[in-house]
């Protein structure tokens, strides 16, 4: 029979091994200082095999002393000096158009130094990889750029916003990348640049230790669930006492934090 400690360790391993790159924290671990993996993302999404990633950072905090600051999931720079912000969004509410606009603007203000000319402003790409097709046209990619209404020509200001629909998982290069985002086993990944890191994170002791915050998040969720369960049990016992003392359904609902349906069910059991 497993001890509590061994059982908890087994559960944690299961949690880690069930993670995929659509999990924001796990994606961060997969791409942290991993130029090759970041390069795959950018090359496939932009359709450019010549992109060379110079550096990649996760959870980059950009301070705005005059307004809203932001923490970017993934921030990469390529050999041409272009900046790429990649955000994974499982919630539709996390990927509104104005958020993409704001992220594009803070990249501009952060990377143009006071002594630089406007012409030196680097090209920026804000890429939202969404769990659902938030723009609702069933396209795999949505490339969004400013244009001139009168002649439909692009307004070349160097800013790019891209939405990637992760529901489109066909046999194209992009579709296979989307398949990999939902894959939990290294051996089943299409892109080998992801496999080695995933193998390390999921199946090595050092990798498990590296994922401390994921484990802590799991433990916090577990503790919260236990606390809620304990509180619920206390509320049930309290409600039983009120009903046994002849208090009304309405009074018991008001004071026990249980729903009316739950209190009525308790009352029917007590009177049975």
Give names to the regions the model predicted.
Residues 148-157, 162-167, 177, 181-186:
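Low-complexity, glycine/alanine/valine/leucine- and proline-rich hydrophobic stretches
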Residues 25, 39-40, 98, 125, ...:
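Active-site-proximal helix/loop capping residues that flank conserved catalytic or ligand/cofactor
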Residues 128-131, 165-166, 202:
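Pocket-edge structural micro-motifs
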Residues 2-19, 77-79, 84-89, 175-272:
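Short, charged alpha-helical interaction segments and adjacent helix-coil junctions
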Residues 1-157, 170:
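Accessory alpha/beta interaction modules
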């Amino acid at each position: 029979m497993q001890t509590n400690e061994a059982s908890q360790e087994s559960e944690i391993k299961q949690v880690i091994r069930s993670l995929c790159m659509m999990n924001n924290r796990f994606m961060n671990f997969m791409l942290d200082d991993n130029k090759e993996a970041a390069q795959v993302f950018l090359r496939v999404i932009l359709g450019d095999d010549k992109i060379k990633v110079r550096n990649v950072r996760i959870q980059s905090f950009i301070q705005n002393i005059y307004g809203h600051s932001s923490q970017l999931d993934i921030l990469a720079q390529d050999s041409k000096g272009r900046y790429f912000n990649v955000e994974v969004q499982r919630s539709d509410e996390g990927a509104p158009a104005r958020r993409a606009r704001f992220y594009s603007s803070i990249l501009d203000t952060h990377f143009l130094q006071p002594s630089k000319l406007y012409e030196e402003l680097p090209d920026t790409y804000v890429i939202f990889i969404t769990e659902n097709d938030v723009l609702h046209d069933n396209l795999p990619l949505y490339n969004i750029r400013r244009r001139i209404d009168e002649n439909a020509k692009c307004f070349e200001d160097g800013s790019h916003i891209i939405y990637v629909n992760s529901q489109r998982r066909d046999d194209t290069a992009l579709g296979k990348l989307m398949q990999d985002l939902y894959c939990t086993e290294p051996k089943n990944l299409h892109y080998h640049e992801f496999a080695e890191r995933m193998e390390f994170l999921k199946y090595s002791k050092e990798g498990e230790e590296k994922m401390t915050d994921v484990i802590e998040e799991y433990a916090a969720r577990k503790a919260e669930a236990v606390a809620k369960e304990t509180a619920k049990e206390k509320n049930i016992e309290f409600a039983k006492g009120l009903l046994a003392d002849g208090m009304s359904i309405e009074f018991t609902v008001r004071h026990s934090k249980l729903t009316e349906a739950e209190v009525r069910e308790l009352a029917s059991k007590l009177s049975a």
